[in-house]
């Protein structure tokens, strides 16, 4: 029984260790903004505003994902606050992600949209 208590203490310590960063970041909020609809061949432009923390105060990447109707999530790309970008190879030629640390925002531009780009778009950290 004593051994079980020791194991439980270690488990709780581990859980607290894992959960602590999430408590600290729980106030962070991301809000997408942009047009609801874009016509074929046009450029989709979306902005994500970060509140509850500075976009440049952490070593995290900020990104965009999308979910087409009836399908799973698809990663579009990510950006570091310094401007380093990484894009989904299948979208790379049409995607630009940029960051504006003065406004605490990062943005997505997807050019030459088609019906295949129909999806719900999300910003994420």
From Swiss-Prot:
Keyword annotations from UniProtKB, A to Z: Adaptive immunity, Cell membrane, Disulfide bond, Immunity, Immunoglobulin, Immunoglobulin domain, Membrane, Secreted, Signal
Region called Framework-1, residue ranges: 27-51
Region (Complementarity-determining-3): 124-125
Region: Framework-3, residue numbers: 86-123
InterPro entries reported for this sequence: Ig-like_dom, Ig-like_dom_sf, Ig-like_fold, Ig_V-set, IgHV
Disulfide bond positions: 48-123
Residue ranges annotated for the Ig-like domain, each copy included: 27-125
Signal peptide region: 1-26
Molecular function (Gene Ontology), one example: antigen binding
SMART domains to which the protein is assigned, alphabetical: IGv (SM00406)
Region Complementarity-determining-2, residue ranges: 79-85
A Gene Ontology cellular-component term: immunoglobulin complex
Subunit structure: Immunoglobulins are composed of two identical heavy chains and two identical light chains; disulfide-linked.
Function as written in the Swiss-Prot or TrEMBL entry: V region of the variable domain of immunoglobulin heavy chains that participates in the antigen recognition. Immunoglobulins, also known as antibodies, are membrane-bound or secreted glycoproteins produced by B lymphocytes. In the recognition phase of humoral immunity, the membrane-bound immunoglobulins serve as receptors which, upon binding of a specific antigen, trigger the clonal expansion and differentiation of B lymphocytes into immunoglobulins-secreting plasma cells.
The name this protein goes by in its record: Immunoglobulin heavy variable 4-39
């Amino acid at each position: 029984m004593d051994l079980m208590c020791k194991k439980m203490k270690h488990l709780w310590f581990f859980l607290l260790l894992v959960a602590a960063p999430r408590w600290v970041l729980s106030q962070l909020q991301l809000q997408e903004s942009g047009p609801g609809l874009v016509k074929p061949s046009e450029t989709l432009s979306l902005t994500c505003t970060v509140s509850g923390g500075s976009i440049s105060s952490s070593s995290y990447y900020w990104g965009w994902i999308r979910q087409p109707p009836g399908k799973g999530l698809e990663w579009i790309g990510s950006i570091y606050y310094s401007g380093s970008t990484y894009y989904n190879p299948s979208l790379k030629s049409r995607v630009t992600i940029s960051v504006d640390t003065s406004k605490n925002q990062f943005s997505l531009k997807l050019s030459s949209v088609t019906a295949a780009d129909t999806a719900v778009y999300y910003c994420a950290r």
